Amino acid sequence: AACYSSDCRVKCRAMGFSSGKCIDSKCKCYK
């Protein structure tokens, strides 16, 4: 599955992280 930066950020924020980005086509969240 493709990783979209905007979707990733939204998902991460919804889980309580400050943001997220795509690395190797996976969404990675960070504090």
Curated annotation (Swiss-Prot):
Positions of disulphide bridges: C3-C22, C8-C27, C12-C29
UniProt GO molecular function: potassium channel inhibitor activity; toxin activity
UniProt xrefs under InterPro entries: Scorpion_toxin-like_sf, Scorpion_toxinS_K_inh
Pfam families: Toxin_2
GO cellular component: extracellular region
GO process terms (BP): envenomation resulting in negative regulation of voltage-gated potassium channel activity in another organism
UniProt subcellular location: Secreted
Positions of the record's site feature: Aromatic residue of the functional dyad: Y30
Site keyed Basic residue of the functional dyad: positions: K21
Tissues with expression: Expressed by the venom gland.
Keyword Secreted: yes
Sequence similarity: Belongs to the short scorpion toxin superfamily. Potassium channel inhibitor family. Alpha-KTx 19 subfamily.
Function text: Blocks voltage-gated potassium channels rKv1.1/KCNA1, rKv1.2/KCNA2, hKv1.3/KCNA3, rKv1.6/KCNA6 (IC(50)=75.9 nM) and, to a lesser extent, Shaker IR (with the inactivation domain removed).
Domain comment (free text): Has the structural arrangement of an alpha-helix connected to antiparallel beta-sheets by disulfide bonds (CS-alpha/beta).
Name of the protein in question: Potassium channel toxin alpha-KTx 19.2
Organism: Buthus occitanus tunetanus
Organism classification: Eukaryota, Metazoa, Ecdysozoa, Arthropoda, Chelicerata
